[in-house]
Curated annotation (Swiss-Prot):
Pathway: Carbohydrate biosynthesis; gluconeogenesis; Carbohydrate degradation; glycolysis; D-glyceraldehyde 3-phosphate from glycerone phosphate: step 1/1. The active site is at H100, E169. NCBIfam families: tim (TIGR00419). Substrate binds at N13, W14, K15, G175, S208, G229, G230. The lineage of its organism: Bacteria, Bacillati, Cyanobacteriota, Cyanophyceae, Synechococcales. The gene is tpiA. Belongs to the triosephosphate isomerase family. HAMAP family: TIM_B. This is Triosephosphate isomerase. It catalyses: D-glyceraldehyde 3-phosphate = dihydroxyacetone phosphate.
Length: 253
């Protein structure tokens, strides 16, 4: 895991799952299990927009924070289906996920648009979680470093790295059950830190994170948290992840 000077962020991305009623039930089951979680980490949940208010109410009095799965770069306007940073702030949101591989793929989101979303987030006082990662084809062609460096450099233009989280999510590992080897995940996270040039940058790993591999991942020197998809949909599973314990020192090499 990172040195204690780097904030640790454990985030669950629900994607298009959970109604308001389900979010409320989730919180009731989840909160007792993380009530005594170590204070060296931030626990974050990213529900669908429709469940943000309900979940915020259900989490009242706890340290669990809310993230948005998207944010537009304009304050207001004729942008059907979008939501502004100001609107999210009013709901008590603290983080925004930008650049996830799914909107990159399904909506052809560009690095420039992702950068605009990240900049709008920071300007409003939200912390963007910038997702970067390579496809299986790019990985097989030894393009991992080139692709991710481009995403980092273009996505972070004009961004303050002290108010930022970067999530390395190899696309080939998202929702596939395939997990990037912890040593390789750590290597890429270290490269990202060097490219950004900010030693205290919080860098997450994402891609088939589950209770069975969280301890090993968090023992790595350049991994400062995780962005969890499917395993965050079950409160018991995500609570185990949020309550991770450090693996043996040997695994941290």
């Amino acid at each position: 895991m990172s040195t204690q000077s780097r904030p640790v962020v454990i985030a669950g991305n629900w994607k298009m799952h959970m109604t308001c009623a389900q979010a409320k039930q989730y919180a009731a089951a989840f909160l007792p299990q993380v009530a005594n979680a170590p204070k060296d980490r931030s626990i974050v949940l990213a529900p669908p927009f429709t469940a943000i208010s309900t979940l915020q109410e259900a989490l009242a009095g706890s340290d669990v924070q809310i993230a948005s799965q998207n944010v537009h770069w304009k304050d207001s306007g004729a942008f059907t289906g979008e939501i502004s940073a100001e609107m999210l702030l009013e709901l008590g949101v603290g983080y925004t996920i930008v650049g996830h591989s799914e909107p990159r793929k399904y909506f052809s989101e560009s690095d420039e648009q992702i950068n605009q979303r990240a900049r709008a987030s920071q300007a409003a006082g939200l912390i963007p979680i910038l997702c970067v990662g390579e496809s299986d084809e790019q990985r097989s062609s030894n393009e991992t470093e080139r692709v991710i460096r481009r995403q980092v450099e273009q996505g972070l233009e004009g961004i303050d790295p002290s108010k930022l989280v970067v999530a390395y999510e190899p696309i080939w590992a998202i929702g596939t059950g395939k997990t990037c080897e912890s040593e390789e995940a750590n290597r890429v996270c270290g490269l990202i830190r060097n490219w950004v040039g900010y030693p205290n940058l919080t860098i997450q790993y994402g891609g088939s994170v589950k209770p069975g591999n969280i301890d090993e991942l968090m023992a790595k020197s350049d991994i400062d948290g995780v962005l969890v998809g499917g395993a965050s949909l079950e409160p018991d599973s995500f609570a185990r992840i949020a309550n991770y314990q450090m693996a043996s020192a040997a695994a941290a090499a």
